[in-house]
């Protein structure tokens, strides 16, 4: 099955749609690079966009080599900003967006929804995945 899948991808019969579930660092010294880290004292420096953090690496970029969610495809998608709608009688929020295939071939896109807890009785990760959906267009 594996070889057949690779052949179908190489010949364009299928479109790759996978995304990285982790960040890939430039070198081992950047590990861990993840969204599951809890909040620390490092804050972005807003005054100088070239020096985004209070600390930085001297020989490699601060950003990972391949960031979380990176993926390749034969097509391209656009996703509108999310729309939030609070339900009147329930303690829940509906979140929606529109996904459009702007490429020339059919494909699949993973739409992911993350939350950030600003104030909680316990320390929470910076971002937590709460919902995802695979859209074939």
Regions found by a protein language model. Give the residues of each.
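Conserved small/polar residues in nucleotide/adenosyl-binding loops
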Residues: 136-137
């Amino acid at each position: 099955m594996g070889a057949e899948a690779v052949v179908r991808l190489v010949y364009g019969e299928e479109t790759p749609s996978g995304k990285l579930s982790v960040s890939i660092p430039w070198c081992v010294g950047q590990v861990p690079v993840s969204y599951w880290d809890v909040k620390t004292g490092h804050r972005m420096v807003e005054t100088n966009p070239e020096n985004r953090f209070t600390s930085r690496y001297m020989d490699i970029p601060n950003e990972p080599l391949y960031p979380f969610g990176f993926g390749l495809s034969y097509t391209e998608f656009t996703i509108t900003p999310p729309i939030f709608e609070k339900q009147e009688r329930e303690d829940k929020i509906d979140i929606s967006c529109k996904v459009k295939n702007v490429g020339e071939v059919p494909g699949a896109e993973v739409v992911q929804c993350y939350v950030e807890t600003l104030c909680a009785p316990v320390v929470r990760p910076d971002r937590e995945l709460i919902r995802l959906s695979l859209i074939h267009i």
